[in-house]
Amino acid sequence: MAPRLSLISPDFTRLWFGQAVSSVGDMVFSTTLMLWVATVLAKNESWAPAAVSGVLVAGGIAVLVVGPIAGVFVDRWDKRRTMLGTEVLRGGLVALLAVVSFLPADALPAGVWLTLVYGTVLLLHAAARFFAPARFTIIADLVTGEADRARAAGITQATSQTALIVGPPLAAPLFFTLGVQWAMLFNALSYLVSYVAISSVRVAPAEKAPADGSGTGKTAGHRSGVLREFVAGLRFFGRSRFLVALLVFAVIGQFGVGALNTLNIFFTTENLGMSAKLFGYVGMAIGVGGIVGALCAGRVVQWIGARRTTWVSLLVSGALLVAYSRQTGFVGGIILLVLFTIPLTVLNTAMAPLLLSAASAEYRGRVVAVFQPMTQLAAMVAAALSGWLAGTLLRDFDGSVAGLRFGPIDTIIAVAGLCILLSGLYARGALPDPETSEDGGPTGGPAGEEGAGEPAAPAEETAAPAAAVRSPAPPRRGSTE
């Protein structure tokens, strides 16, 4: 029997503890990095906003370029060793930047400092692309059953949201009182704690997966190149209607959330009449809603199932976002933002067991490596599109429908809510309830038996056999998880 203080199991508890410490360290690091760039490296410069945005661009490039191919290697490698190796790499990178930052700011040109910052962020995010699918796969091995997997996802979500609330308030005092170096060293130390926690997790050694997932496991894994394994992962994903459905409504929903993330600062100050100094309360409201949703998610999934939870959460959150777009007061807006984040976090939690069960063990790394870059790309496109619409095409928009007035920002956010509603309607049809649909196979739902959900390999491969919608949190600038 597991100890009373365990979360699901002792091994999962140790894995969670490492994530908790590392997440707080990431938030401290990301907030510190933004403060350092904005107030020191680019202080009083006209290009300061561009310098700050470069941090986001560096992280996004790593996700889009490294993310898809990382899953191939994760499926090949030992998952626990992969996680340990990435923690060593990330801790070393942050520690190295911390040591260099002991130099006076004027010791190096601003361009050199920014190159060091962007390079570090890019490498941290690149390493995280290996860490995330490896952790995803280990959780699948440690936690079984839809309810427990949903509970594990809920705990993970709650931990991330808590770090979002705790990290930034820690970062500012560290930065302004002790300096950027000590805030960075705090993050490096968090990677060390995570390394120790992960090294104590006991994971049964897995058999090396064949490159094409055919299950024969002979020598083709050595003959197959990375590209072939990557294509095999894409083929597996594309032949699973269930996985494609998950990706489609995740991307549609991400368009809605991405627009909110981009324009929320303008909505709260212009439509809600809130002072920019109070914008921190928006992040706190999102964090509170995320924690409540994460804590409720496991029970909700247990009651109505992961599939029904997914499409219901999309419909509810979409309707709440439309309602949020009509608010004109600070209190009402904050309350609706909390309520909106709750079902969205429940949605993220419900999707975890669906992904875990839909992907065969040898493809889990590649499934995650397809999912994350696509949703990241959707978020980037949504941010660019919504910003362009608000600043150009709809800048002077002023209309009314049935006595309700619409301006540019609230109109875009309302359309974003409709996108999430559309995603929910699509999910309702694409993810039928288990009692009304038979799962299995590449065109069905999650694999319930060995080989379910795997695509039939082409003849030449059989002859020679050889891989989530984010809560509207303030951008984790520089975060690597």
Residue ranges and their predicted role:
Residues 466, 479-481:
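Soluble, non-transmembrane alpha-helical interaction regions
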Residues 79, 466-469:
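Compositionally biased, intrinsically disordered low-complexity regions used as flexible
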